[in-house]
Amino acid sequence: MAAVSPTRCQDPVTFEDVAVVFTDEEWRRLVPTQRDLYKEVMLENYKSIVSLGLPVPGPDVIFQLKRGDEPWLVEFHGFEGKEGAENVSLDWETKPEIQGASEEEKSEGSLKENLGRKGPPSPKVEVYVLDGRLGTEKESPTVEACKKPPSLEESLRHRATPPKKFLTKERDQECSNCGKTFFDHSSLIRHQRTHTGEKPYDCPECGKAFSHRSSLSRHLMSHTGESPYECNACGKAFFDRSSLTVHQRIHTGEKPFKCSECGKAFFDRSSLTRHQRIHTGESPYECNQCGKAFSQKSILTRHQLIHTGRKPYECNECGKAFYGVSSLNRHQKAHAGEPRYQCSECGKAFFDRSSLTQHQKIHTGDKPYECSECGKAFSQRCRLTRHQRVHTGEKPFECSVCGKVFSSKSSVIQHQRRYAKQGID
């Protein structure tokens, strides 16, 4: 019986056909078991090609996997080019020796990056997948048709109980505090630090602690003075590229992050996240003194100063101290000169735009801040906050003379005037 000639595929198979490279973001979403499975499948695919007995050079991704490196920075040098893009070339050079690499790694080559150079064409070997296995042009197995090489997903599907989320990337890691979901457990752990306040990364220079390693890395640059990313519009320099990108949107006016509820747009995602808590009512930052919760960590920090009585922001003109830097800035404008922002309705002038905006609500009747207990509405958030103390019974302001507590700062001041009249300090 005559041997049946194999039906030739139109395109020969290269390692690129059976290889998958993740982006940085995709790689971070994989848990360790998924990464190990990926590496195992990639190495098996490569060994299948090498098992033909031909000196096929090892792509950079294989060198990285064998050394235990993460493969997401890999680009397949040698698979892009003119003549060598479709076939595996045997014209190869020895890869520079890597300290600590095995003899097997040192002996494997890397593809010539300049595939379009002049000179005689290099010998090539065409590799095909025939009847589910790899073969060369010299072989003549009795098969009816060539098959495409199995993809990574197909390889994983035929392995023993592959993790389903490796293929679908489901968000199955849920925070028990707020219900937010994540792709992997490590992202969930990092998120939960916003609830616990845990900051495991300490700066060796000043002792300041951070909840994320990346935040510590950016902070360390403040000690070295390194600011490698400079804005070409204004010359301002930044510690990291992401901060520069956000800053440049000030010049371009781009606001790519839009609220799905009200349509308001923002320069960065974190500002959008903070804004959306207005709609959801989420307040993940809780005061450990009184239990009051806030939508932003900065607001919690300012609130906690009430309990300590510390006012870290002091005016260098008159010495008056404030809880927040914004209050200090508004105060300092009083020293700077005439108020710049004037109400078109009554002519009253203010030192900053936010104060004018708050004032204009008196004329418009706008009261966007409503009490969830009784439904009473207010034009300013601070007035709603004071009102809510009627329901909660909270009295955060304490007299330093007698220890009596009050629900508002103005009540403390009025109370202390009695001591001033009596000459009591």
Curated annotation (Swiss-Prot):
The keyword Zinc-finger applies. Keywords: DNA-binding, Metal-binding, Nucleus, Repeat, Transcription, Transcription regulation, Zinc, Zinc-finger. The keyword Zinc-finger applies. Residues 97-124 are annotated as: Disordered. One of its GO terms (molecular function) is zinc ion binding. One of its GO terms (cellular component) is nucleus. Residues 14-85 form the KRAB domain. GO terms for biological process: regulation of DNA-templated transcription. InterPro entries: KRAB (IPR001909), KRAB_dom_sf (IPR036051), Znf_C2H2_sf (IPR036236), Znf_C2H2_type (IPR013087). PANTHER family: ZINC FINGER PROTEIN, ZINC FINGER PROTEIN 2. May be involved in transcriptional regulation. This is Zinc finger protein 2. It comes from Bos taurus (Bovine). The gene is ZNF2.
